[in-house]
């Protein structure tokens, strides 16, 4: 059991209780009770560290030393689900300190901010502060993207850079939902366009789409089938050259071009849930807003 996973569980169960309340009230009650128990565990174990692999586990680690964002998310969702003001002190404590903001798998603090900003029947000062923070993040991101000749915020492309870009698209959509702004919609589209081929490599990073897309993914089910399954987003450019194959063939290449379509390159061509899910959000959000135009470069 990790503190961070327990916080995630509490948040998701609380959200589920709200979503299922009018569909299956018994299940919703079960979810809410589970959320409260998980939150009680967090409260009883404040000194518990974040997550690192146990000694006997040698596969890739998903470390998370910052736990305040998960605690915040749990408190926010339980506050929204119950209306219990006892959670407000915990929320304010985290918001007044340092916590990891973001939409990834480790830094998740922007999710609870967005839910606070959208919620009804809650403390108005909390709601306003959350909205202001989301808009501040979006404005900072917008300025960074506008300085780029490929309209993305990344300069040194990390492992899973496409996740970062899809997450940026999510943030623009979230901000637009809170305060309509054509620039947010424009740059949400630009993040989508990058993923679908408007990038230095010319690759559409979603398998099975476009004239040039990955055909040799680091994806075991596809390797068993003998061909890459369509509809999967790969990690994309990684200037860290973090596997032997990429290091051998991409050394000295510009950061945005550090991509190779080869199943041995797990740092470039891996497929994961957590960089496909933000792309689904981005595509669905753009469809929901009815935005289908192509912006002039």
What are these language model-derived features?
Residues 21-22, 53-58:
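Short acidic, glycine/proline-rich loop/turn micro-motifs
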Residues 95-102:
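Solenoid-like repeat scaffolds
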Residues 1-16, 61-93, 110-147, 155-296:
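Aromatic (Trp/Tyr) and acidic
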Residues 26-30, 51, 292-296:
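Short, glycine/acidic-rich hinge or "gate" loops at secondary-structure transitions
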Residues 48-51, 59-61:
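Flexible helix-coil transition and linker loops at the boundaries of alpha-helical arrays
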Residues 1-38:
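A conserved hydrophobic secondary-structure block that centers on an alpha-helix together
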Residues 36-40, 44-47:
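Hydrophobic, small-residue-rich alpha-helical packing segments that form membrane-like cores
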